[in-house]
Amino acid sequence: MSSQNAKSIGGILETSTVPLVIQPQIVNDPAQNNITLPITLCAVCGDTSNGNHYGVPTCFGCSGFFRRTVRNKLVHGCWNGDGNCVIDKANRNRCKSCRIKKCFKKGMNKNAVQPERTSHSYTVEYVELPSFREYSKGLLPTHSDRLRFQHEHAQHEIDTSSVLVHLKNALQWVQQFSLFAVLSDVEKSQIILTQWPHLLCLALFENSEKIFIDEKFAQLAEKFKSLELSAQDYFLLKGIIIFTETKDGTDLKFDRQLDICIGLLNQLHLESSKSKSGRLLFLLGELKSYSTRQLESLLDLKACEIVISFL
């Protein structure tokens, strides 16, 4: 196939809203000769379609991704930060932001997604407090903990040493988190190695550390501060951060753990502010799209030593 033809086909896959049907296959069957079976491709990633889902022919992977995103009202940050990632069979798991954008572009209907069925008859209020206590037991900072830390650093200019203290505390928190503790050693190492920078950002925001990394970091810090988040909010946001899919293309996924954390966050604000959990998830997506290279460069080998000690 010429490069010009290949480019044309790539353009059709990216922009067309009409289901793409490739050349029919000829199946030689002893009972029936020359039966033609047209193969319809997924409108989102180009994989083989398994039928119409939410109004558009898609594969099971893209339809399931669309359903989870709509049900949980998830907001994702772009993997590259420009909103123009290629979504195909090989790269569909890399950028959730561009993938859901393409789902909508191809005409998938969010109103066709049914609410998740449940056989439980108890109310959300009944589940909320016991569930949160179960996962957060012993991990929420007390008022005295915060005062002690503030006192220890009150007389000193904020420098990398205080940031490293927060990093160590954040990783200790992760190791004691019940949803993390049950994972395999490989899964634990993967999370610590890939998620520590953004986890550290949340720890710095939570403790209102006045440290300037770059302009974007300062903007994010101000946004988190303006929401006046509780310790419970930060607890669940840290849980969501560590279980969110990473940029490195790893096959490790933590959908169950992620769903639990998001569900608890939604329950936390069910009565007080139904829109707050949505704003928090949107802001968390913005944090995930933030490049932490400057922060990592600032901490250099000292951070590496701390991270490695937790593997």
Curated annotation (Swiss-Prot):
Chief localisation class: nucleus
Database matches in InterPro entries: NHR-like_dom_sf (IPR035500), Nucl_hrmn_rcpt_lig-bd (IPR000536), Nuclear_hormone_rcpt_NR2 (IPR050274), Nuclear_hrmn_rcpt (IPR001723), Znf_hrmn_rcpt (IPR001628), Znf_NHR/GATA (IPR013088)
GO CC annotations on file: nucleus
GO biological process: one example: positive regulation of transcription by RNA polymerase II
Keyword line: DNA-binding, Metal-binding, Nucleus, Receptor, Transcription, Transcription regulation, Zinc, Zinc-finger
Signal peptide: none
Nucleus in keyword set: yes
Compartmental location: Nucleus
Molecular function as annotated in GO: nuclear receptor activity; RNA polymerase II cis-regulatory region sequence-specific DNA binding; zinc ion binding
DNA-binding region listed in the record: 39-115
Domain NR LBD: 116-311
Zinc finger (NR C4-type): 42-62, 78-98
Similarity remark: Belongs to the nuclear hormone receptor family.
PANTHER family recorded: NUCLEAR HORMONE RECEPTOR (PTHR24083)
General function of this protein: Orphan nuclear receptor.
Annotated protein name in UniProt: Nuclear hormone receptor family member nhr-111
Organism listed in the record: Caenorhabditis elegans
Gene name per UniProt: nhr-111
